[in-house]
Amino acid sequence: MRTLYIDTSSSYLYSAIVEDNNILGEIKEEYGQSLSEVALPRIVSIFNDNNIKPEDIDKIIVVNGPGSFTGIRIGITIAKVYSWSLNIPITTITSLEAMSLSSETAKYHVPAIDARRGYVFAAIYDKNNRQILKPQHIKIEDLKQEMSSLDDYVVITNDEYLDEDFDNIEAYNPNLLKIVNYYKDKEPINPHAINPDYLKLTEAEESKMN
């Protein structure tokens, strides 16, 4: 079984093609604001470098948020086009769960993404990936309160701005093989039903409400 994984929910592109228990090709690169321009060509390069055709993919897993609003849309669009045009089953995973799955260093995992203005996108999972606190847009101080009862935790993030707010920081380094193997048997979703899960309103939506 060959699975294509796509995560463009941050300034990084994380993508891989996994066959059974082997990574055939992967990308873990930071592109910043140029991600929208390079995401598709770099994903195509994984196919080309490994002599794999898109129609050889059996499953697609795409991160649907939270994170960068623009980035999330890019990854979802690419994944949906592959899925719909080639009739490839597709499913989603949250960026926070992917972050949690990639850590092995503590009893509790607290993936956190800077959401500005004193907020983060965050969740809490135990080491067996059982959800303790559901993914949400939460004040940093409120998250600290939720964490106060945890006896052994790590905060997983790639946002250096959060280093001042939390102890026990671990830089996010995605374990793409583990993520894919954990989710490859998840029930597929109609590609037309897949939408970004921002966990908060966009700034444009917030402006309309004010």
PLM segments and residue spans:
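Buried hydrophobic packing segments
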Residues: I43, I78-Y82, S100
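Residues at secondary-structure transition points
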Residues: E30-V38, F69, R73, T77, ...
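DPxDG-like acidic metal-binding loop motif
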Residues: K59-I90, S95
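Conserved short-loop catalytic and cofactor-binding motifs
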Residues: I27, P66, E187
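N-terminal beta-alpha supersecondary unit
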Residues: M1-V62
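A general structural signal for well-ordered alpha-helical segments in protein cores
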Residues: S36, L40, G75, A79, ...
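Oxyanion-binding and handling regions
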Residues: M1-N22, T91-N210
